């Protein structure tokens, strides 16, 4: 079957090759599906169909077979080249598929390697900066943030199992803060911007730090809470629920009380409701500053003390049970009460400064009003003086115009007066000489 098929295909090549040798080269570069070499590797059924088609052709196409058989070695070389090209194409396709699968797997491995390498570098940098942290303690996570002081110190917050550290380098100044996790007494969310909640407060017994510009505040807060497991889940002032003292007060109060006690407790309820409204107003406001939160904590502690005192006076029989409860709450929140006391002192100092500020502002307002009135008065006086000067200049002008006509006569009269004065002086001199001569004569006669 192969021997019969070769001449017929060779005839086709013979008619194409002598006319245009370039076409043979183009056909040699085609794929295996378009080249005649694919016919040689086809099934016997396809070969039978092709033989029938070739038998139907004209005898002129089959007549030059002897000459083609003479050229069969060249055609065999072409066929071998085509088979090689088809094999090379198949190998290239398989290589491309392998490259695609490798390229799909490469990004995942690269990401894992890059994340592990970045974590390793961050851990090394963390232990290099903070030598007090043991090298066996790995870094959990680092966050970019800024420490709020007189200016913002941009840096990084490092969190490990037992340490919370911050490092910043601004204007060549290194700022390092190391906070042991067990010494943290308060972790609170706060706002320094109007719209973006981006700040956290970390407080100890002695210090208080505000970290702002946190891109993922919630994740940072959760990680810090997990590290500081000794803290309570809710911070003071963040929950809108009533305080523990108020809850205990409402739980211990019986349903039926005398009329006098009802009046007293109604007053206390009004105070508590007012405090609660203040707390809700602070929590519903768009921006919360640390000062407002501090004042809110002070109000809560103040309301608790008022409730405790009033309850001790109204119900002496249950005072012992209530006193037993209060120290437990105080034992749990001793650092928070220490902070609230300091905040209360600051609040008192600020309240004392407020009247002085009011008096100074009133004094400055009075001075400004006096200056405004004096400026108006000076302006009025200047206008009146300008009017008077205008009148005087007009009078002088009219007087000059009136005296302009007899100016010639006046000059003549003045000239005559001067002449008369000169003559009179000359006569007086002569009279004096005569008098002197007469006196001399009289003296000589005597």
Curated annotation (Swiss-Prot):
Family matches, as Pfam families: GRAM
Keyword Phosphoprotein found: yes
Keywords: Acetylation, Phosphoprotein
Residues in GRAM domain copies: 124-191
Record InterPro entries: GRAM (IPR004182), GRAM_domain_protein_2B (IPR052633), PH-like_dom_sf (IPR011993)
Domain of life: Eukaryota
Compositional bias (Basic and acidic residues): 95-113
Annotated positions of the Phosphoserine modification: 239, 256, 266
CDD domains linked: PH-GRAM_GRAMDC
Biased composition annotated in UniProt, kind: Low complexity: 29-43
Keyword Phosphoprotein carried by entry: yes
GO annotation, cellular component aspect: cytoplasmic microtubule
SMART domains xref list: GRAM
N-acetylmethionine, modified sites: 1
Region annotation (Disordered) ranges: 1-120, 234-253, 276-298
Ranges of biased composition (kind: Polar residues): 234-247, 282-292
Protein's name in the database: GRAM domain-containing protein 2B
Organism field: Pongo abelii
Gene designation per UniProt: GRAMD2B
């Amino acid at each position: 079957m192969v021997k019969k098929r070769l001449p017929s295909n060779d005839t086709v090549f013979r008619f194409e090759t002598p006319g245009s040798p370039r076409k043979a080269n183009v056909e040699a570069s085609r794929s295996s599906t378009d080249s005649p070499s694919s016919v040689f590797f086809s099934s016997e059924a396809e070969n039978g169909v092709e033989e029938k088609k070739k038998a139907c052709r004209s005898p002129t196409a089959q007549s030059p077979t002897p000459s083609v058989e003479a050229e069969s070695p060249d055609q065999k070389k072409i066929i071998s080249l085509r088979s090689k090209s088809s094999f090379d194409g198949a190998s290239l396709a398989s290589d491309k598929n392998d490259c695609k699968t490798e390229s799909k797997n490469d990004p995942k491995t690269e990401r894992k390697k890059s994340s592990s390498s970045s974590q390793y570098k961050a851990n090394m940098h963390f232990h290099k900066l903070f030598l007090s942290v043991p090298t066996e303690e790995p870094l959990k996570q680092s966050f970019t943030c800024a420490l709020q002081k007189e200016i913002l110190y941009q840096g990084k917050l490092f969190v490990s199992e037992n340490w919370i550290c911050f490092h910043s380098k601004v204007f060549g100044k290194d700022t390092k803060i190391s906070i042991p996790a067990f010494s943290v007494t308060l972790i609170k969310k706060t706002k320094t911007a109007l719209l973006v909640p981006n700040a956290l407060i970390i407080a100890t017994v002695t210090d208080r730090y505000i970290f702002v510009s946190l891109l993922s505040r919630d994740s940072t807060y959760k990680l810090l809470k997990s590290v500081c497991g000794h803290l309570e889940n809710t911070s003071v002032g963040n929950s809108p629920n009533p305080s523990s003292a108020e809850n205990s007060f409402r739980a211990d109060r019986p349903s039926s009380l005398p009329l006098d006690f009802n009046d007293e407790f109604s007053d206390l309820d009004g105070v508590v409701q007012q405090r609660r409204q203040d707390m809700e107003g602070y929590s519903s406001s768009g921006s919360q500053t640390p000062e407002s939160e501090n004042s809110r904590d002070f109000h809560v502690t103040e309301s608790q003390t008022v409730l405790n005192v009033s309850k001790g006076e109204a119900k002496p029989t249950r005072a012992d049970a209530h006193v037993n409860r209060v120290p437990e709450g105080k034992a749990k929140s001793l650092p928070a009460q220490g902070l609230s006391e300091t905040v209360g002192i600051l609040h008192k100092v600020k309240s004392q400064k407020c009247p002085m500020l009011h008096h100074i502002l009133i004094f400055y307002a009075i001075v400004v009003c006096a200056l405004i009135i004096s400026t108006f008065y000076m302006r009025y006086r200047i206008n009146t003086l300008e009017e008077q000067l205008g009148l005087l200049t007009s009078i002088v002008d009219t007087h000059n115009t009136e005296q302009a006509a007899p100016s010639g006569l006046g000059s003549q009269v003045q000239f005559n007066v001067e002449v008369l004065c000169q003559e009179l002086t000359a006569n007086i001199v002569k009279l004096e000489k005569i008098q002197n001569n007469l006196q001399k004569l009289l003296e000589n006669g005597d």
